């Protein structure tokens, strides 16, 4: 899979690309990244990529032309194109599973007051990572990319993906423990030591349901409505 990032701050993406599991996948040529500074495509002699808002409003908007020209520079115009914006659909695991099937994805990160609305005509989808505001789209773009990359075959073990939170009916993960067996009167549940795989599986599912009910009751409500 190839992922393009269109941004005004290319160095933001270095930790994602150059560390840990994703770097190993890059070295194995399972993943490929291309970071593009769309400021390089402005026709302004001052390298300006934003301007005042028609009709009034605070701040400056990112112009459509530099982004359009940056997309023109990409192979097959960047594959499936995503605008990272607070106005987009909320990103979730189902979306990650869908996006992981593409050969090439482009994530466009904004700044300032956002994008000229005509940028939305250039993309396939608008995505948000939540109902809150950040200083720019780079961090959300990396969140989306990280979530997608780990689903690409060969990046991590298949078993790890299958056991993730949100993969099993969308439920949160069950509690997990390691040594020591007891710490400051906090004990690991005895069922995990009895060797009865059926009982352990039942405990895990019950624990998933309890944790999901406690922390994300909206997920249970959604699952109920889908059935």
Swiss-Prot record:
Belongs to the RNA methyltransferase TrmD family. The lineage of its organism: Bacteria, Bacillati, Mycoplasmatota, Mycoplasmoidales, Metamycoplasmataceae. It comes from the Bacteria. Pfam families: tRNA_m1G_MT. This is tRNA (guanine-N(1)-)-methyltransferase. The keyword Disulfide bond does not apply. Specifically methylates guanosine-37 in various tRNAs. GO terms for biological process: tRNA N1-guanine methylation.
């Amino acid at each position: 899979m190839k992922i393009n990032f269109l941004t005004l701050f290319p160095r933001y993406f270095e930790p994602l690309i150059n560390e840990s599991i994703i770097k190993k996948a890059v070295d194995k040529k399972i993943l490929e990244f291309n970071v593009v500074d769309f400021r390089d495509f402005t026709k302004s002699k001052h390298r300006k990529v934003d301007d005042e808002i028609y009709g009034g409003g605070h701040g400056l908007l990112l112009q459509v032309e530099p982004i359009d020209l940056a997309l023109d520079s990409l192979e097959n115009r960047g594959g499936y194109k995503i605008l990272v914006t607070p106005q987009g659909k909320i990103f979730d695991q189902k979306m990650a599973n869908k996006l992981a099937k593409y050969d090439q994805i482009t994530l466009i990160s904004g700044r300032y007051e956002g994008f000229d609305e005509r940028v939305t005509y250039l993309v396939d989808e608008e995505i948000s990572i939540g109902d809150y505001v950040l200083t720019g789209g780079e961090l959300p773009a990396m969140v989306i990319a990280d979530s997608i990359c780990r689903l690409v075959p060969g990046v991590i073990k298949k078993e790890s993906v299958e056991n993730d939170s949100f993969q099993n009916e969308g439920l949160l993960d069950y509690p997990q423990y390691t040594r020591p067996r007891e710490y400051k009167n906090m004990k690991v549940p005895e069922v995990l030591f009895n060797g009865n795989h059926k009982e352990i599986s039942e405990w895990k599912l019950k624990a998933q349901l309890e944790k999901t009910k406690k922390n994300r009751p909206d997920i249970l409500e959604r699952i109920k409505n889908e059935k």
